[in-house]
Amino acid sequence: MNSDPRPAAASPDDPLAERRIGGERVYDGTLLDVRRDRATMPDGSEAVREYIVHPGAVLVVPVHDDGRMIVERQFRYPHNRSFLEFPAGKLDPGESALESGVRELIEEAGFRAQLWLRLGTIHPVISYSTEAIVLYAARGLVHVGARLDPGEFLELVEYTEPGLQEAIDAGRVTDAKTIAALALYSRWNAAPARSARLRITGRVQGVGYRDWAMRAAALAQLHGWVRNRRDGSVEAHVQGESRACDRFIDDCREGPRACRVERIEIERAPVDAALAGFRLERSD
């Protein structure tokens, strides 16, 4: 088996890199794909590396408009106990992290969401797995009913943000991905200023959405730009005081009367010191 199942090297010139020589699959089960490789070490010696190949996963922090969070209670067989954790699951073949998050939120919690904030990516078991988990927060929840997979059993409970933090401090929540996701979400909420990219999909072109968004952002004294995209969506970069940005994002869920916003994807963006005022940009 000559092909390398690991992600591409982040830095080909890393002096600490271990170079794969070859390897084999030693176990291919329903869940686990276990590999054993031979690799050259930085000093030229050889070593064996055993690890699990993982398709990737997504976690969703579902948040009601009043701030309550949806958490699952689910039995985890290896630990012989139930855990409190946010909805999460593996990516299906050919599925993006966002598509997987939308699917998992419906299947496990029974909700659709209009607003999707990408919190970041974590690597939970860097010593023996390729697993990477993309973390999202989802708002604008609408109940549609859960669609659990066969053999999947769980209970849904709700926490406030302080209540969930208290449960972590007390040791009642120990799931690492849930702790990381809450920390990133809390950091977003606590930040005094925002810089974010928005992608708005739905019936948003040809109905004045772009011009409406520009006026709304200018009234909120935000900096940035907005433009139509060839794929039919509207893209914006907004930068400014957190409460003003959040009000603008909430307003974007409605938009002008003739539009129909299906989804807003939000991703943190570097602060652009050159942004002044709010302007229209050419379509991409």
Specify the residue positions occupied by each region the protein language model found.
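Conserved Nudix-box catalytic region and its N-terminal flanking loop in Nudix hydrolases
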Residues: 2-10, 14-17, 49-52, 58-103, ...
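Acidic, metal-coordinating catalytic segment for phosphate/diphosphate chemistry
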Residues: 18, 22-59, 65
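Conserved beta-strand segments that form the floor/walls of ligand-binding pockets within enzyme
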Residues: 70, 85, 104-106, 117-118, ...
